[in-house]
């Protein structure tokens, strides 16, 4: 009887593995489409947006990629079936970003001088790989991954744009972050945390959740402001992911 049970279970297991593989392949394809779409959109901004954005056009183009690519989280959450293939895909994008950055191609696509280096866009997928690994080893859940990725994408991206568009003082001589940018970071991160906890984590919307989200948002803004050497694309997502254990 045991042999019959094992034989019956084998096709079911094979079918489940095949379904997982199909989800992972679709996830990889959608990941490439997403990245190429936002790179193409940023290129359009570079070529056609100077009249609208002026000298800020390269920065806007860079943030189009920064914000847009963060939506990859939804592919990871709803399409991918395992953690290994998202990490493989992110590893590929890390190497591709690094190569384009070293050659200056990435800067040209962003409308900048070819000698400019955008290591932040290289750090971005590395930080997501680390966050996924931390989740894989039980140090957080899917909602925490969403908070980390989307707060970095939307929070940091919009904070940078608002910080440059709105004249306000710097937080201090030790940072380039402004009050306007940091307030934007706090507001956007707070919204992201609430949405992720409610819709991904299944938590009820309460005053306690709002308070915890506000504390996480302030913490994220402080990490961003105090991170040296432009490494906030690494520090912010990882810090948010880890602190979400207490939310």
What are these regions, as identified by a protein language model?
Residues 6:
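Luminal/periplasmic acceptor-recognition loop/helix of membrane-associated glycosyltransferases
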Residues 3, 11-37, 43-87, 95-246:
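Interhelical loop and helix-boundary elements at the membrane-water interface
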